[in-house]
């Protein structure tokens, strides 16, 4: 009897812990709303990419997001960052995605994961590893056996890294995106039948599910591109949509006549190209649109809330028929509410003042800026002549110029 009493006491002691764990992890889409812990909870998110910020600053930037009134952080996952060579994975230092997610959870924030496999993001090759182009029979972003073999390996490996951080297991990850703006690709690749596009999109969603991702899934596209981008079983969200009526109309069309309604990319700034003017977006207009969303039960994700820096050779490029190739800057400041250096901007204050009027939780003050250092004058000394060094290397001879990929050169420079 005494033994049974001890067991009963232990069970009673454990039950509150289990209940806390379950309530802590509860996030669902129900009755046209997002629910967290049984309560309707708008997702007020900001996009911040772990790889564009030194890991020593992650917590500070997350605290700045909280100080703005946000409750969620969204991030892309960059496949080529983590698999620089086939089968060789790296999740250390600034690439430690799990640590970034844990830090967000410690700061009381929800996390939205956007693993692609294609991510755009003005990132080199849209996040695809360069070596995919050397795989025989490979056709990227298609219902192609070789391509899907590698996407499965990536998604499975990603799950091993962050799967236990889903809210279904007590972690902060509440949503995962399927593919990325796929409707844009469908619109551009009319040479591929729509049914094949949809088959590929569905297979990426299935790979996420098969790996073990079991939080709500979603897609993100321009509202006029849902036909190609939406996929059954995933919440369709709109990018850059300011018209509330149109947002609700198109989401209803592809989501059983109900929400929740979310703008997965709400642009408080814009990207920058070399040799072009730096784009600037006014604070007052962004504040008004933020209030409009809050008044109409529309969740949103600021893309970007803090841009950071394209380190190394990670910056990508766009293409414009009038300008040809448009390489992105090393800076990914994005004219975001939090500057590249991690400082408060007038846009930050304007958004914070709006959000504070609508949320029921206390919005903390923004943390103090990180201290800066004064760098003394640096005298450069010639060590070697780069071109002279290159000329001493054994050349590769070919009848026609070879690509970097053909030379197994992922990044850097090639002298032709």
Tell me what each language-model feature is.
Residues 58-126, 130-131, 205-210:
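Aromatic-lined substrate-binding rim segments of carbohydrate-active enzymes
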Residues 39, 76-88, 93, 121-146, ...:
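Aromatic- and acidic-residue-enriched carbohydrate-binding clefts of CAZyme catalytic domains
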Residues 113, 117-150, 156-302:
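Substrate-binding/catalytic cleft of secreted carbohydrate-active enzymes
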Residues 148-162, 169-178, 183-184, 188, ...:
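Carbohydrate-binding surfaces of carbohydrate-active enzymes
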Residues 47-49, 76, 179, 306:
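Conserved residues at the C-terminal ends of beta-strands
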Residues 20-72, 102:
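N-terminal carbohydrate-binding accessory modules
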Residues 56, 91, 95, 145-149, ...:
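Soluble non-cytosolic domains of exported or imported proteins
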């Amino acid at each position: 009897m005494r033994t049974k009493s001890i067991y009963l006491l232990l069970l009673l002691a454990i039950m509150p812990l289990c209940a806390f764990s379950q309530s802590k992890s509860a996030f669902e889409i129900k009755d046209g709303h997002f629910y967290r812990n049984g309560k309707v909870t708008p997702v007020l998110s900001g996009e911040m990419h772990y790889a564009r910020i030194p890991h020593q600053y992650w917590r500070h930037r997350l605290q700045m997001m909280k100080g703005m009134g946000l409750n969620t952080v969204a991030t892309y996952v960059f496949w080529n960052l983590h698999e620089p060579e086939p089968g060789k994975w790296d999740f250390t230092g600034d690439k430690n995605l799990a640590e970034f997610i844990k830090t967000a959870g410690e700061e009381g924030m929800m996390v939205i994961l956007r693993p692609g496999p294609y991510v755009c993001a003005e990132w080199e090759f849209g996040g695809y590893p360069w070596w995919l182009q050397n795989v025989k029979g490979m056709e990227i972003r298609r219902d192609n056996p070789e391509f899907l073999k590698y996407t499965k390996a990536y998604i499975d490996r990603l799950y091993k890294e962050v799967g236990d951080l889903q809210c279904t297991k007590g972690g902060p990850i509440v949503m995962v995106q399927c593919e990325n703006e796929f409707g844009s690709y469908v619109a551009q690749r009319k040479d591929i039948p729509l049914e094949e596009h949809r088959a590929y999109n569905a297979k990426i969603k299935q790979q996420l599910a098969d790996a073990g991702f079991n939080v709500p899934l979603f897609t993100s596209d321009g509202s006029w591109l849902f036909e190609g981008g939406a996929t059954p079983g995933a919440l369709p969200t709109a990018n850059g949509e300011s018209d509330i009526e149109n947002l609700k109309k198109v989401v209803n069309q592809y989501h059983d006549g109900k929400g929740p309604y979310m703008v997965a990319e709400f642009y408080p700034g814009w990207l920058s190209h070399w040799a072009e003017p730096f784009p600037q977006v006014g604070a007052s207009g962004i504040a008004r649109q933020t209030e409009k969303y809050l008044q109409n039960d529309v969740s949103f994700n600021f893309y970007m809330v803090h841009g950071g820096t394209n380190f190394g050779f990670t910056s990508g490029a766009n293409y414009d028929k009038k300008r040809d190739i448009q390489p992105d800057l090393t800076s990914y400041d994005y004219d975001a509410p939090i500057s590249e250096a991690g400082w408060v901007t007038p846009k930050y204050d304007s958004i914070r003042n709006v959000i504070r009027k609508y949320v029921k939780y206390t919005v903390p003050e923004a943390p103090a800026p990180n201290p800066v250092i004064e760098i003394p004058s640096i005298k450069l000394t010639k060590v070697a002549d780069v071109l002279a060094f290159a000329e001493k290397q054994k050349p590769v001879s070919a009848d026609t110029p070879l690509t970097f990929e053909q030379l197994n050169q992922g990044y850097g420079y090639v002298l032709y």
